[in-house]
């Protein structure tokens, strides 16, 4: 089980949202790179970054902070938020991002995502509300089922599927194991759970489910409901 500490970038700061609502942003650090360094020192192999401004603007907006993180930290980085064309993918990889997350574009242009997955290290972010895919920074809900979207990429060379239950994201209400397992079983691609993680019992439930490869940890760390250094020692 790979643990992915998460940092959402908004206006150059590290924040967390509740249920994806921008006006719910709570600032946890004015220097995101220092947080990433802290995760690295705890034992993180990966850190999950989301450019929130980018998700809404359709292009990365926190480049200065992303570059600063890369310059100061050796941990592997995956980045999502507003990455919707090949030039942006190449630019992110050139500045040292290890894996690019494609979200909204996966619904609107799955062929493009498959082409990119054949050339670059790509993860697909599937964010869902009541089982249906949410797009455009979670501002819209599509008519596509999350499991159907996952199946679309079954043999495309995608490195990972990151599935988020939007209704639980940032709520500390517990991870949706069943939803994550449905996605994992639908596509047979390494699947990472996201949304609602509160404490060690959530990590244990994901490990016990067998078939889920990773978990994104955000507010549970920031609010102190999960002992992250202990989790790295136990599960990494």
From Swiss-Prot:
Q: Which GO terms describe its molecular function?
A: 1-(5-phosphoribosyl)-5-[(5-phosphoribosylamino)methylideneamino]imidazole-4-carboxamide isomerase activity
Localization recorded for this chain is: Cytoplasm
Tell me which GO cellular component terms the UniProt record holds: cytoplasm
Q: What is its main location?
A: cytoplasm
What is any Pfam family matched here?
Answer: His_biosynth
What's a BP term from Gene Ontology annotated to this protein?
Answer: L-histidine biosynthetic process
Active site (UniProt):
8 (proton acceptor), 127 (proton donor)
Record EC number = 5.3.1.16
Keywords tagged on the record:
Amino-acid biosynthesis, Cytoplasm, Histidine biosynthesis, Isomerase
Cross-referenced InterPro entries, in alphabetical order?
Answer: Aldolase_TIM (IPR013785), His_biosynth (IPR006062), HisA_bact_arch (IPR006063), Isoase_HisA-like (IPR044524), Isoase_HisA-like_bact (IPR023016), RibuloseP-bd_barrel (IPR011060)
Q: Which reaction does it catalyse?
A: 1-(5-phospho-beta-D-ribosyl)-5-[(5-phospho-beta-D-ribosylamino)methylideneamino]imidazole-4-carboxamide = 5-[(5-phospho-1-deoxy-D-ribulos-1-ylimino)methylamino]-1-(5-phospho-beta-D-ribosyl)imidazole-4-carboxamide
Copy the pathway line from the protein's UniProt record.
Amino-acid biosynthesis; L-histidine biosynthesis; L-histidine from 5-phospho-alpha-D-ribose 1-diphosphate: step 4/9
Say yes or no: keyword Transport present: no
Is-annotated flag, keyword Kinase? no
Task: Identify the NCBIfam families for this entry.
Answer: 1-(5-phosphoribosyl)-5-[(5-phosphoribosylamino)methylideneamino]imidazole-4-carboxamide isomerase (TIGR00007)
Membership in a protein family: Belongs to the HisA/HisF family.
| Protein name per the record | 1-(5-phosphoribosyl)-5-[(5-phosphoribosylamino)methylideneamino] imidazole-4-carboxamide isomerase
Species for this entry: Sulfurimonas denitrificans (strain ATCC 33889 / DSM 1251)
Gene responsible for this protein: hisA
